[in-house]
Amino acid sequence: MDSRVSGTTSNGETKPVYPVMEKKEEDGTLERGHWNNKMEFVLSVAGEIIGLGNVWRFPYLCYKNGGGAFFIPYLVFLFTCGIPVFLLETALGQYTSQGGVTAWRKICPIFEGIGYASQMIVILLNVYYIIVLAWALFYLFSSFTIDLPWGGCYHEWNTEHCMEFQKTNGSLNGTSENATSPVIEFWERRVLKISDGIQHLGALRWELALCLLLAWVICYFCIWKGVKSTGKVVYFTATFPYLMLVVLLIRGVTLPGAAQGIQFYLYPNLTRLWDPQVWMDAGTQIFFSFAICLGCLTALGSYNKYHNNCYRDCIALCFLNSGTSFVAGFAIFSILGFMSQEQGVPISEVAESGPGLAFIAYPRAVVMLPFSPLWACCFFFMVVLLGLDSQFVCVESLVTALVDMYPHVFRKKNRREVLILGVSVVSFLVGLIMLTEGGMYVFQLFDYYAASGMCLLFVAIFESLCVAWVYGAKRFYDNIEDMIGYRPWPLIKYCWLFLTPAVCTATFLFSLIKYTPLTYNKKYTYPWWGDALGWLLALSSMVCIPAWSLYRLGTLKGPFRERIRQLMCPAEDLPQRNPAGPSAPATPRTSLLRLTELESHC
C-alpha cells in the first residue's frame, strides 16, 4: 500500500504528502493507499485486460465468424456494453474508494450481492487461470535446448503412430489412419499425460506442480505489498509483451505464406452476420477481454485519487485493448499462413483457439522456423507475462475486497501479506487437481462454466440496472462530473439505462437457448455428473445476487416498504457533487456528505 496521505493546499486542491513512516489512522489501521502516479494505474489495468484472450481467442473468433465482418458486431458490443460497463466499474471504485464488494454496499446495499458474485467468479478464476502459466512455464523451460522436444518422434513418450511431417511432399512421413504429430504427443503424453476421462484423475504431474508453485511464488511477490509493489511490477509485465508481440509480428509477416494467413484472418464474409452465434461470440469476447464484472476494475480504480480523469483513462484503455487484439491477429495468422503453405493443407486445418493455439498450433509452426528454440522462448515468455499480470491483478482484486470488508482485521502491519499468502496457498492446493493426469478435464469444466460469458452477462445486467435505475444514472453522472470536471459522452448514460441491460439480457437468454454440453477435443463427452458439477460452478456466482437481496430483506427489521427503502439508499458518507460546480472554491468535504431531499427519497 502507498504511504501517501492527502493534504489540502490553500486553493483547495489535494496534494500528496510523503511521510517517512507508514501512516496510520486514529484507530491504528494502516491507510488504504493510492497509486504513486497515473501510469501505475494505467499499466495495471492494461496488464489485467490485455491477456491471453487477445492472442489466442480474438484472432480465431475473427477468422471463424466472417473475418472483417466480425468487427461489426464486435464494435456494436464495444460501444453498447464494453466501454459503458468498463467506465461504470472503474468510476465506481474511484468514487467510493472501496473494493469490489463494499463499493456496491456503499451505493446500494440491496445489490451488495453483485460484489459477492464477481468475487466468487474471481475465486474460481484464480484457481484455474494460473494453470495456463504452469503449462507455459513447462514449455518455456523445455525450449532451452538445441532441438525442441516436440519436433521429432524419437522420444520415450512417442508412440508407433507418431509421424514427422515431410515439408517436401506436404504429407506425413508414412501412412496410418491413427497417425499423430509429435507436437500433439508432446502435449498429451509428455506434458499432460492425459487420462481417458474425468473419472480417472490419476497421479499428480509433479513437474507441472513445480511450475505452478513457481507461478504462485512470482504472483505473490508481485502484489504482496499492495499497490506499492504492483505499481512497480507492471512497468515490466504490461509493456514487455508488446515488445515480444512486435518481434513475432515482424517475423511472421516476413514468412512465405503470411499474406494467405492474413487474408483468411480479415477477408469479410458478410453472410455470417445473419448467424446469431457470431453476435454471441462478439459479446462474450468483449466481456472476457475487458475483464468486466470481475471486480478487478473497481479494485484498481479505488486506488486512484478522487479527481483522476478516469473517463479519459477508460476510453484509452478500451481502444488499446481492442487494438492489441487486432494486431495480435496479424502475428498469429501470418505464422499459421506460413504453416499452411509449408504443409500444403487449408488454413482451417491449422487454425486453433485457446490452449490448442498456444500449445499445439504455434509450437508446430515454430519447429518449421530457423532458430526455432529462440522463437519458442520468445513466444512462451510472452504467454507467461500476458497471463501473469492478469493473474496477480485478479488476486489483488480479491484481497482488496476482503481487506475493505474487514479493515480492522487486515489493515494492520503484515496482515495483508499473510492474507495474500493464505489466498495463494489455498488456490495452489486446489489447483493441483488440474495437474493430475485427468486434470485437463477439470480445467475445461472451470473454463466452460465457472467464468463463462453467461455468468459475466448475468452480473452485467444487474450492475447496469443497479447504477442506472436504483442509484440513478443522473446522480452517477453528477458524481463523475465532480471527479473529472465535466460530464462524459451522454450516450454512455443511455447505454446504462437501456442498451446495456437489453443487449446483455438478449445475449444471456440466447446463450441459455444455444447451450450445448461440454466436450473435450470434440470427442470426449462428459458424464452427467460432470455437467452437473459445471452448472454448480456457474450458479455459485449467479445465485449470490438474489440470495443476498433476500437475506438482507429477511434480516432487516421494520415494515417491508421501509426495509426496501433503506436497502436502496446509498451510504451517507459518500461525497456528492458540489452544487457550485467542480471549479468552485473549495468546500469542506463534510458539507457534501449527505444527499439533499431533492436528490433522493432516502
Swiss-Prot record:
The keyword Transferase does not apply. GABA transport is inhibited by beta-alanine, 2,3-diaminopropionic acid and SNAP-5114. It holds the Pfam family SNF. Residues 142-206 are extracellular. Residues 1-40, 549-602 are cytoplasmic. SUPFAM superfamilies: SNF-like. Glycans are attached at N173, N269. The modification Phosphoserine is found at S591. Keywords: Cell membrane, Disulfide bond, Glycoprotein, Membrane, Neurotransmitter transport, Phosphoprotein, Symport, Transmembrane, Transmembrane helix, Transport. This is Sodium- and chloride-dependent GABA transporter 2. It comes from the Eukaryota.
